[in-house]
Design a protein with these regions (language model features):
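Glycine-rich Rossmann-fold phosphate-binding loop(s) that bind the pyrophosphate
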Residues: 85-87
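N-terminal Rossmann-fold NAD(P) dinucleotide-binding loop
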Residues: 90-91
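Rossmann-like adenosine-cofactor binding region
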Residues: 130-213
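N-terminal ligand-binding/catalytic initiation module
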Residues: 1-59, 65-67, 74-77, 225, ...
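Adenosine-phosphate binding glycine-rich loop
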Residues: 185-280
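Glycine-rich phosphate/pyrophosphate-binding beta-alpha loops
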Residues: 54-58, 176-182, 251-253
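NAD(P)-binding Rossmann-fold cofactor-contacting core
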Residues: 100-125
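Short helix-loop-beta connector
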Residues: 73-80, 103-104, 169-170
Length: 280
C-alpha cells in the first residue's frame, strides 16, 4: 500500500509505504532540494531500524525496474542500446539492462553536456568491457537502437518530448522515466506497458501527452498491458514483431520498500552501516 498523497509541511514531503513483509517505510523529501532520506521501520514494534540515502536507493530501484522491463520486453536478439542521459540514474539502468539482455553488444549515449557524455561513455566502456560511444545528438543515439532508454529525468510539470517517432526503429523497446517524454503521435502508435493504467493517468493528474489522449478517448485501460501480467502470465503486448513497446517506468514507489529491505538485510549481514539508538 502506498499513500499517494504525500504529507507536506514546512518544506518537507512524506510518503508512507507498507508491503506484505515485516517492514514498513517512509520517504522524506526536504529542503534544500534533493535532500532525501528513506526510513525503514519494524512492522511489529514500529521502531525505526534504518535510515538510508534515498537518492542511491531510488537509482537502484529504478535501474532494477528498467532491467526487468528490458528482460521481458526487448526484441529478440537486441544488439544496440540507445541512451539519453548520463546522470546519476543512468549507470544502474545500464548495468541492469546489459545483464538482463545478454545479446546487447554496444551502447550509444547522448546528453546535453559533451564532457559528461564522454566521461560516462569511458566509464561504462571500462566497467562493461563493451563499446560505449558518446554521440552528438539524441537522434543519433536513438536511430537503429533495439532498446531506447530515456534516462533524462526532465521536469514533471513540463511537456518536453525527447525524441520524434520516426527515430524509433520498428519493434524497439522504449523505456521512459516520465510520461511527458513522449509525443501523442508516438503513444498512439505503440504498445504501452506499465504497472497499471492508473499509474499513468493518476499521479495525481495525467501528464502530457496522456492528458490529451485521455480527454479525446484515445487512451483507455485496455491500451495498457500490466508489467505484472507480462512477468507472471506471459502476456505479450506485441501483436507482431514490428510493434514498438513503450514501458512507462513511473508508479513503482512501493518497490522502494523492497529494495530498502534488501539493502538493510544485505548491509546487516556484512556488518556495514553505523548503528544508532533513538531510545530515550
Amino acid at each position: 500500500l502506498v499513500d499517494r498523497r504525500p504529507g507536506e509541511f514546512e518544506g518537507i514531503r512524506l510518503s508512507l509505504l507498507a508491503g506484505d513483509g515485516l517492514l514498513s517505510g517512509m520517504r522524506v523529501f526536504g529542503n534544500p532540494p534533493h535532500t532525501r532520506a528513506f526510513l525503514l521501520f519494524d512492522g511489529e514494534t514500529r521502531a525505526m531500524v534504518a535510515l538510508m540515502d534515498y537518492g542511491m536507493l531510488n537509482s537502484l530501484r529504478v535501474g532494477a525496474t528498467a532491467g526487468v522491463a528490458a528482460k521481458y520486453l526487448a526484441p529478440a536478439g537486441a544488439k544496440t542500446l540507445g541512451l539519453l542521459g548520463s546522470g546519476w540514474q543512468a549507470p544502474p539502468q545500464v548495468f541492469a539492462m546489459v545483464r538482463a539482455v545478454p545479446t546487447l553488444e554496444r551502447i550509444k549515449v547522448y546528453s546535453r553536456t559533451p564532457a559528461n557524455r564522454e566521461a560516462f561513455a569511458k566509464q561504462m566502456a571500462t566497467a562493461l568491457e563493451m563499446p560505449v560511444e558518446a554521440v552528438g545528438s539524441a537522434q543519433e543515439a536513438i536511430e537503429g537502437a533495439d532498446v531506447v532508454d530515456l534516462c533524462a529525468p526532465g521536469h514533471h510539470d513540463v511537456h518536453e518530448p525527447l525524441f520524434e517517432r520516426p527515430w524509433i526503429q520498428p519493434g524497439a523497446l522504449v523505456v521512459s522515466m516520465s510520461a511527458n517524454q513522449s509525443t501523442a503521435d508516438f503513444v498512439r502508435n505503440t504498445r504501452v506497458v506499465a504497472a497499471s493504467y492508473e499509474n499513468i493517468v493518476s499521479e495525481p493528474d495525467a501528464k502530457p501527452p496522456f492528458d490529451e489522449l485521455v480527454a479525446k478517448g484515445e487512451f483507455r485501460p485496455e491500451h495498457v498491458t500490466r508489467i505484472g501480467d507480462v512477468i507472471t502470465k506471459g502476456a505479450n503486448p506485441r501483436q507482431q514483431d514490428s510493434d514498438t513497446v513503450l514501458y512507462h517506468l513511473e508508479g513503482g514507489t512501493v518497490q522502494d520498500l523492497y529494495v530498502a529491505t534488501w539493502g538493510y538485510e544485505w548491509a546487516k549481514a556484512r556488518g556495514l552501516g553505523k548503528p544508532f539508538d533513538l531510545s530515550l
